[in-house]
């Protein structure tokens, strides 16, 4: 699961110390998974035992994703601000199979990621329902490896102006500036250098803004910042669509296209990328985060 390091203009913990939180994510993800596996096994054993000799309901143990109070206290003392500080207990009957358990964990881990990408210990941004339900963000996060960082349409301050970029994916080997096209199944985008493209479906043809405009602006901004901070990592441009075909006979130099015919293949290639997190990758992430804008407010407990 990729790390969401920035969403729009929401405040992010990664902005405080990207090196710390990037490494902490990998460690926490592993720790919580092992705890979940142990809890599932314990529940299974208890269910088997209760089938033979039912025990009082009030004594049954349930798994909780919330950490113990002593763990939270230790983390606050060490200034290690984690996902689980103030989450409510999640009492559930855990799946027995490892596959179902992994799916369960991915869903909860994604929700915690959203929290981490929209708050710090003292500040919080209002997470919109649109972001909570964003299928593209969820898809990319859950499909890409832990070593990938996602900046989801971040807002940067460039020469005193707010500039919203396309999706930025920072892998150990390269940065992808991505325009993700989602439309009716089997629709066709007719690409050109014009300001508008045609989008054709079985019933109609509509004009849509050329996605390359935002993509090339994003590439220009990202490339300039990365070069300025001397983070040696190549920057690429990608049009990605799982639902549609992109017909672009003569695309601009350097523009990669992965449409319905090849989108899954592109994702699979990223999944197979076993390269660990690199220093220049984190350096590039830190450089981009330093330009990001954040709209947040103080947590209530910090105002008292």
UniProtKB/Swiss-Prot annotation:
Top-level division of the source organism's lineage: Bacteria
InterPro entries, per the entry: Pullulanase
Keywords: Coiled coil
Coiled-coil region list: 26-82
Keyword Coiled coil: yes
Full protein name: Uncharacterized protein YtlQ
GN (gene name): ytlQ
């Amino acid at each position: 699961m990729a790390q969401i390091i920035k969403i729009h203009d929401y405040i992010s913990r990664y902005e405080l110390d990207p090196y710390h939180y990037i490494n902490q994510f990998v460690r926490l993800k592993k720790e919580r998974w092992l705890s979940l596996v142990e809890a599932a096994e314990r529940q299974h054993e208890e269910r088997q035992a209760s089938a033979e000799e039912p025990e009082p309901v009030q004594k049954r143990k349930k798994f909780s994703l919330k950490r113990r109070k002593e763990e939270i206290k230790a983390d606050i003392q060490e200034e290690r601000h984690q996902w689980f500080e103030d989450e409510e207990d999640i009492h559930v009957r855990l799946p027995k199979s490892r596959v179902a358990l992994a799916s369960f964990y991915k869903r909860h881990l994604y929700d915690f990621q959203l929290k981490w990408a929209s708050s710090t210990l003292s500040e919080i941004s209002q997470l919109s329902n649109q972001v909570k339900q964003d299928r593209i963000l969820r898809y990319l996060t859950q499909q890409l490896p832990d070593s990938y960082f996602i900046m989801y349409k971040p807002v940067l301050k460039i020469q005193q102006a707010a500039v919203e970029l396309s999706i930025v994916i920072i892998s150990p080997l390269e940065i992808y500036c991505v325009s993700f096209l989602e439309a009716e199944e089997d629709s066709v985008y007719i690409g050109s250098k014009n300001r508008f493209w045609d989008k054709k479906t079985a019933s109609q043809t509509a004009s849509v803004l050329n996605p390359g405009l935002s993509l090339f602006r994003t590439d220009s901004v990202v490339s300039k910042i990365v070069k300025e901070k001397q983070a040696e990592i190549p920057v690429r441009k990608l049009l990605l669509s799982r639902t549609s075909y992109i017909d672009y006979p003569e695309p601009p130099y350097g523009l990669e296209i992965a449409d319905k015919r090849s989108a899954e293949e592109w994702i699979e290639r990223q999944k197979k990328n076993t390269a660990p997190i690199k220093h220049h990758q984190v350096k590039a992430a830190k450089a981009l985060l330093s330009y990001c804008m954040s709209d947040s407010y103080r947590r209530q407990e910090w105002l008292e």
